[in-house]
A protein has these predicted regions:
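Short pre-catalytic strand/loop immediately N-terminal to key active-site residues, enriched for Gly-Thr
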Residues: 291-295, 454-459
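C-terminal substrate-binding/catalytic lobe of Rossmann-fold NAD(P)-dependent dehydrogenases
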Residues: 2-61, 314-316, 320-443, 447-453
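Short beta-strand-to-loop capping motifs
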Residues: 173, 393-397, 459-461
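Glycine-rich phosphate/pyrophosphate-binding beta-alpha loops
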Residues: 380-384, 460-467
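N-terminal Rossmann-like NAD(P) cofactor-binding subdomain of oxidoreductases
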Residues: 2-333, 341, 473-474, 481-485
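Generic C-terminus detector
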Residues: 455-461, 470-488
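A generic structural signal for alpha-helix starts
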Residues: 302, 398-399, 465-466
Length: 488
């Protein structure tokens, strides 16, 4: 027999409430945009960005926030809109404001104050500071325009705001054909994995420039990294991001610093020698004013180290093994052909390929407490994007599956690692669900295995886009363009 469930809401009431929330979310969009463009204020909801988002995306961010609430209550636009409106009237200076956390703090510490008074007091540090920001925009040059280079371009263009942060000024490539500029623009505009570019792109072949969402980008053709005078394009004190992977040590990357207009260099691959390998959220505070060249480590190192740090801080790691199930990359072959690496010459779309990974060793460079405790290996699989790290760990302190999952959920919600660690608890998610994830890694709670002191954790990661977001965070720190974050 069919079970009859009681009806608690009428259809018209349900739709009416949706339309009401939809209208409020729609009213939030111009306020979010004005604060971003005019005040350099970045808004989010528990780490989910609101800039350039649709009405539905804003409503989904509110719905997602229930995972961040102690009582699993859904965050309402009726709660966030008044805070956003109050912010828009305060002539704020540059800031990063989490509306979800502002609501939670108002509920806990409002003490009978009006929302306007609470917001003014909470943001007092930047109230009335519009146009008073002493920061200058930092010019950025992308040396290379492959998978990571194009995703970095998308993120930088998206984050342009009022122009006081990172500004993409040029890309450097080797000329591949007569219609090279058109083809480069097409690859930025369309992507088989990440979808279409969110905006407009125009091409000026006479001057070798692309204009993407108002960003004038000079395309420079060169085969020699040390031979370019960037100042002739109006570029000065620039941060250059080498995403070719061709040079990985200070000597090779130092060629860029010989060029007029370049001040600092970031490598999007594991660095060799004495180069600092930086994973944002873990050791980004190690970046010093005198550091001219740093590495943003690898996608896998970025994915595993935040989770490893969280686990080690709470339970202590005795030892362990890291196995990565990694999507194929353009270093592999479509069909069997010669490759200098073992097994990697075999067809990537047709095979699972066992190969090596330096992530375990690199993790110890970023987090020295793990030195000598981890081994690692990798399996390349026939998917174009999104990988998984399996962390098989022996702990000093025994735990349970429920306890460690809840701990990692809290780390994803309320810790300093919330931009690096995400958390999902669903028996239905698969790899493509994580395309476009902006986190370094996503813990899959349903897959966690625990037996006293032994735990196996599974972390998904978008090895392209998630890693690129981490690179941009490192760039922002190196350039000193990170605004203060609220609530405190």
């Amino acid at each position: 027999m069919w079970k009859v469930l009681p009806v608690t809401q009428k259809p018209d009431q349900c739709l009416g409430e949706w339309i009401d929330r939809e209208a409020i979310a729609e009213a939030m969009i111009p306020l979010i945009g004005q604060l971003y463009r005019n005040n350099n204020v970045v808004t989010s909801i528990h780490g989910r960005g609101l800039i350039n988002r649709s009405v539905i995306a804003i409503m989904k961010a509110h719905r997602f926030a229930r995972h961040r609430m102690a009582d699993d209550a859904e965050l309402s636009v009726h709660e966030t809109f008044p805070i956003l409106k109050a912010m828009s009237e305060l002539k704020l200076g540059a800031a990063s404001v989490d509306l979800g956390k502002m609501v939670a703090k108002f509920k806990a510490e409002g003490n009978g104050r009006s929302i306007e008074d609470f917001v003014k007091a909470e943001l007092a540090e930047v109230v009335g500071k519009q146009n008073g920001d002493a920061r200058e925009g930092t010019d950025v040059v992308l040396y290379g325009f492959g998978r990571i280079g194009r995703l970095l371009a998308r993120i930088l263009i998206e984050k342009t705001g009022g122009g006081d942060g990172l500004r993409l000024r040029a890309i450097v490539v080797r000329k591949g054909a007569e219609n090279d500029l058109v083809k480069r623009a097409s690859l930025l505009r369309r992507d088989s994995v990440h979808g279409p570019f969110d905006g407009t792109i125009t091409i000026d072949e006479e001057n070798n420039t692309l204009t993407a969402n108002g960003n004038l980008i000079q395309v420079i053709y060169s085969n020699d990294p040390a031979s370019i005078d960037y100042t002739q394009y109006g570029i000065k004190n620039a941060l250059l991001v080498d995403n070719t992977g061709k040079w990985r040590d200070a000597e090779g990357l130092g060629q860029h610093l010989k060029c007029p207009g370049i001040d600092r260099v970031v490598l999007t691959a594991p660095g060799k020698g004495a180069l600092k390998n930086i994973v944002h959220g873990i050791n980004h505070t190690d970046i010093g004013a005198d550091d001219k060249i740093i590495s943003a480590a690898s996608c896998t190192t970025n994915a595993i180290v935040p989770v490893l740090k969280a686990v080690n801080d709470q339970y202590g790691i005795v030892n362990g093994h890291v196995e990565t199930v990694h999507s194929y990359t353009n270093d592999q072959n479509l069909i069997d052909n010669f490759h200098k690496g073992s097994r990697r010459g075999r067809s990537a779309p047709l095979n699972m390929v066992i190969t090596e990974t330096g992530a375990a060793t690199a993790a110890a460079k970023v987090l020295p407490v793990l030195k000598g405790k981890l081994t690692g290996n990798a399996i390349r699989v026939p998917t174009p994007n999104v990988s998984m790290a399996i962390l098989n760990l022996n702990l000093e302190k025994a735990t349970t599956r429920e306890e460690i999952n809840e701990y990692l959920r809290q780390m994803a919600m309320h810790s300093d690692l919330q931009k690096q660690i995400d958390f999902v608890s669903s028996q239905e998610v698969v790899s493509t669900d994580f395309v476009g994830s902006r986190h370094a890694g996503v813990v899959d709670a349903e897959a966690t295995i625990c037996n006293d002191n032994r735990v196996v954790l599974y972390a998904w990661y978008d090895n392209e886009f998630g890693y690129s977001c981490q690179v941009v965070r490192v760039m922002e720190d190196m350039a000193g363009v990170n605004p203060p974050a609220f609530p405190r």
